[in-house]
């Protein structure tokens, strides 16, 4: 069984999280610059068995032509071309940034660390992945 990686795609930064090999626990991985994402993923997939990607997608937005929706759609196409052996899922990312910010407060992070957008991005990816795992297991297993 391979890992599942979640991607919280942003125009500037991309938060990444990954499961353990048994696909039980979602953990924050890192945050990379948006233009470095493909290179990072190619390197990571070469050393780790990644079975699937879960891309956070704002599912309840009426205007599908916003810059972020267009960028996420293009990124998904890029993933499909570069990783034909991995499944690619879209998963609702609504409110993940707010949940991540609240988790940092509850976790006792200092104000400086809570303002660090890299922490928010990788934690948002982890929330997306945990939500996907819960939903996936409920519907497909």
From Swiss-Prot:
GO cellular component: cytosol
Alphabetical list of InterPro entries matching this protein: RNaseH-like_sf, YqgF, YqgF/RNaseH-like_dom, YqgF/RNaseH-like_dom_sf
SMART domains: YqgFc (SM00732)
Pfam families in the cross-refs: RuvX
First-tier enzyme category under EC: hydrolase
A biological process from GO: rRNA 5'-end processing
CDD domains: YqgF
Enzyme Commission number, as recorded: 3.1.-.-
Keywords: Cytoplasm, Hydrolase, Nuclease, Ribosome biogenesis
One GO MF term attached to the UniProt entry: nuclease activity
Gene3D superfamilies: YqgF/RNase H-like domain (3.30.420.140)
Coiled coil location: none
HAMAP family cross-referenced by the UniProt entry: Nuclease_YqgF
Family: Belongs to the YqgF nuclease family.
Role played: Could be a nuclease involved in processing of the 5'-end of pre-16S rRNA.
Record-given protein name: Putative pre-16S rRNA nuclease
Lineage, opening ranks: Bacteria, Pseudomonadati, Bacteroidota, Cytophagia, Cytophagales
């Amino acid at each position: 069984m391979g890992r599942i990686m979640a991607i919280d795609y942003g125009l500037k930064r991309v938060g990444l999280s990954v499961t353990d090999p048994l696909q039980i626990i979602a953990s924050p991985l890192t945050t990379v610059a948006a233009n470095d994402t493909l290179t990072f993923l190619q390197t990571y997939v070469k050393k780790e068995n990644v079975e699937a990607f879960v891309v956070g997608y704002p599912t309840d937005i009426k205007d599908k032509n916003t810059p972020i929706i267009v960028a996420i759609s293009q990124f998904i196409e890029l993933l499909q071309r570069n990783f034909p052996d991995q499944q690619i899922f879209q998963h609702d990312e609504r409110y993940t940034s707010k949940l991540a910010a609240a988790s940092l407060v509850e976790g006792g992070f200092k104000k400086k660390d809570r303002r660090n957008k890299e922490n928010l991005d990788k934690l948002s990816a982890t929330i997306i992945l945990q939500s996907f795992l819960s939903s996936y297991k409920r519907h497909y297993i």
